[in-house]
Amino acid sequence: MNKPLASIGLDADNFWSYKRTHGDADWVERPSYLPVLTERMITSFSKHQIKPSVFVVGADAAAADGPDFVQALTEYGCEIGSHSYEHDPWLHLYSPQELRDELKRTEDALQAAGAPKPRGFRAPGFAMSPDLMRALVELDYDYDCSVLATWIGPVARQYYLRTNKTLTKSEREDRKALFGSLWDAGLPNKPFTWKAPCCEVDGRTLPAVQLTEVPVTVFPMARVPIHASYVIYLSGYSVPVAKAYIKAALAFCKATGTQPSLLLHPLDLLDGSDAPGLEFFPGMNMPLGKKQEMLDFILEAFAKQYRLVNLAEHAESIKGIPVRERGIDVLSRGREVNPAAPKN
């Protein structure tokens, strides 16, 4: 009997992008851990015989160590997706033209680094908008995977804003939709289709939207995250509880017919010695060996129940199958744009 499929994707957020989101001024120096990350990723992927999608930031692909990173993953067999050019978690504030320019600039950087034209996109910080979905369709993307259908994003944002006292008023305004909207909890937890009719904007006729969405899977019904960073952080308090949590999440996925999409991050494979200054990030005080053990458990648990594929294959698998549809206008809820809000 064939196993149902599940997909795995890693958002290749670099050292500087974490510092930028946190508001650290020295992010402009663009510190990078890509050489170390490359080795850790391929070692882990090889161990578990998986070839995930890796969503790469365009500015990193264009940096000195970017081509080696992209080429190593491409040669290994990973799908390379787009994660925007500047990793702005306030991408929803961009105008339609700025979004097209950002996406095209990223495509050019990824292809110059040795990857094919990206087929899929994940927004940094789950910063979605109706204009973003239209831009993805205009540029012929096959799928998006930016939805995290949870209520916990606004809670995490409030904690982040309360504990980060150094942010300016402008920086706080930029981050007011960080980690998504409360309304996102009402979006499907299974793949669905974004839809919208054609329309005219600034004298341009924009095509109708029909775009596959593969959400980052959350715990069915409870709608809390299950991606690796959360489970690894939980294991810092109790390994048995973390293992029970992931087992329960997979049991609920099976019961609800959810073919999950698991999100990984670089910091799942790194510790504080690899990225000094990121101690604020949950789990960065854990020894690398402990993190690797928990990640191994997560990947093994998924592999026992599912055939692990990349996001492109997951998106392709639902073509021709009736799925839910959502209008792109729902992405405006909780992400109201302030035209005066500056972008850094």
Q: Which residues does each PLM region occupy?
A:
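Metal-dependent polysaccharide deacetylase catalytic core of the NodB/CE4 family, i.e.
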Residues: H48-L132, Y141-R157, V209, V218-P220
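C-terminal domain-boundary segment and adjacent tail
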Residues: K47-Q49, Y233-N344
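Histidine/acidic-residue-rich catalytic or RNA/ligand-binding cores of hydrolases
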Residues: L91, V155-Y160, I226-H227, G272-F280, ...
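A structural motif corresponding to the C-terminal end of an alpha-helix
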Residues: M41-I50, Y76, A109-P116, V201-Q210, ...
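Conserved, mostly hydrophobic/aromatic
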Residues: D11, F45, I80-H83, T106, ...
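Active-site beta->alpha N-cap acidic-glycine motif
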Residues: M1-Y76
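Active-site-adjacent pocket scaffolds in enzyme catalytic domains
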Residues: A115-P116, A123-G257, K343
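The substrate-binding groove and active-site-proximal loops of carbohydrate-active enzymes
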Residues: A25-S32, F55-A59, H87-L99, P118-R119, ...
